């Protein structure tokens, strides 16, 4: 379960970086060359999704919970925004949902 969770976090980080770099280019007039590492990051994101040992729909559903938590960590660390009680509560609920889905892998 820990390996799967860490793989989900790595997957989410690749997706967020792959989307953040074009955002920098479009919204903050950063270099167009950021699109190259963005594309690589998104390709890595897709590849990482294939490493999960479950049907794609379950992987995507469980991944959503981890993505929420990773995005909130990004909000805190990169954007410098203090997380609210609602952020923490939502992240906990999303993570619990992910754990329930992953716990059922192989049992259905």
UniProtKB/Swiss-Prot annotation:
For the Cytoplasmic compartment, the record's topological domain ranges are 27-30, 82-84
Instruction: List membrane-spanning regions.
Output: 6-26, 31-51, 61-81, 85-105
Known Pfam families for this protein?
A: UPF0060
Q: Report the subcellular localization.
A: Cell inner membrane
Q: Which UniProt keywords apply?
A: Cell inner membrane, Cell membrane, Membrane, Transmembrane, Transmembrane helix
Q: What InterPro entries does the database record attribute to this sequence?
A: UPF0060
Q: What is its main location?
A: membrane
Could you name the domain of life of the organism this protein comes from?
A: Bacteria
Homology family: Belongs to the UPF0060 family.
HAMAP family membership: UPF0060
Q: What is the protein's given name? A: UPF0060 membrane protein YnfA
């Amino acid at each position: 379960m820990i390996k799967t969770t860490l793989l989900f976090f790595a997957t989410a980080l690749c997706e967020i970086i792959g989307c953040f770099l074009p955002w920098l280019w479009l919204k903050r007039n950063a270099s167009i060359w950021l699109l190259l590492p963005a594309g690589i990051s998104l390709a890595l994101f897709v590849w990482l999704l294939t490493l999960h040992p479950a049907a794609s729909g379950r992987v995507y559903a469980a991944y959503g919970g981890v993505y929420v938590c990773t995005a909130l960590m990004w909000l805190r660390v990169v954007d410098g925004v203090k997380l609210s009680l609602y952020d923490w509560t939502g992240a906990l609920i999303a993570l619990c949902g992910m754990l329930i889905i992953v716990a059922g892998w192989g049992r259905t």
